[in-house]
Curated annotation (Swiss-Prot):
Its cofactor is [4Fe-4S] cluster. It comes from Beutenbergia cavernae (strain ATCC BAA-8 / DSM 12333 / CCUG 43141 / JCM 11478 / NBRC 16432 / NCIMB 13614 / HKI 0122). This is Lipoyl synthase. [4Fe-4S] cluster 2 binds at residues 81, 85, 88. Disulfide bonds: none annotated. Its EC number is 2.8.1.8. HAMAP family: Lipoyl_synth (MF_00206). It comes from the Bacteria. Keywords: 4Fe-4S, Cytoplasm, Iron, Iron-sulfur, Metal-binding, S-adenosyl-L-methionine, Transferase. The keyword Nucleotide-binding does not apply. The lineage of its organism: Bacteria, Bacillati, Actinomycetota, Actinomycetes, Micrococcales. Belongs to the radical SAM superfamily. Lipoyl synthase family. Gene3D superfamilies: Aldolase class I. InterPro entries: Aldolase_TIM, Elp3/MiaA/NifB-like_rSAM, LIAS_N, Lipoyl_synth, rSAM. One of its GO terms (cellular component) is cytoplasm.
Amino acid sequence: MTIAPEGRRLLRVEARNAAVPIEKKPPWIKTRATMGPEYTELRSLVRREGLHTVCEEAGCPNIFECWEDREATFLIGGDQCTRRCDFCQIDTGKPADFDADEPRRVAESVQAMGLRYSTVTGVARDDLADGGAWLYAETVRQIHALNPGTGVELLIPDFNAEPDQLAEVFSSRPEVLAHNLETVPRVFKRIRPGFRYARSLSVLTAARDAGLVTKSNLILGMGETTAEAVEALADLHAAGCDLVTITQYLRPSPRHHPVERWVKPEEFVELSDEAERIGFLGVMAGPLVRSSYRAGRLWGQAMARRGLEVPPALAHLTEPTTSRQEAASLLR
């Protein structure tokens, strides 16, 4: 394999990855397609209105559960990222022209879908003078303006930790500000060459200092050890991270980093317990957990543990419930 699907030649790292065959998934990597009434109604509406979500377009296995709770995820900034991470399905290249109308369209999609909680993520836009900070912030502002009772989780790149860019994003006041660390220091440069471990931690610290609920994610199976994962959890908490998700790496294509180990549900339970001991306000861990999985529920848990008031429209997010992809649920 020497040519990528989009017609360009493979990068050296991609060619090296492609020499390793795609791994066979273990039996515990599975999900059930349970289509409840809310999911069915939402799917019909999305098809009828021609709306676009990451949930459908990325084929997320958790779409049935999240849509049943009226939660969905949107990607902004285009489909080309200016950075390349060895695990990420999004293509790297020259992004499309900046679309200043995108925040309005996302907000209208949230309204049309009747979402109670939405996650907004996007690509890195180092080609823009502000790194795309206005686009991220304006999307949150537009969602809140058009949907006053809807919660927003904003998953951001690091904006090179530029104070002015971060201040613009933080001023939009999302319910949760997320920035994903993803992996441990020893393999960080190989997996995320466009990012820096300490810089990612500093973004979370800045968000905490701005009074926001903060969140991050760790992906297992890219060369880390369990002990290193625990150390990364401690680093995240020390940096001011409130919420954390822990997940299994699934290789998107032969061009991406090979899976180095399959983490059993029992280890996810142990890491979840360790994260609770470290002091996180909310933890979601399991092979098919993703950073936006049951995002509203995790935020509700954090608010309850902080003793903070939850708006009436989002009160359902504080009710005790089980999540199908949590490792503890898989062991029952």
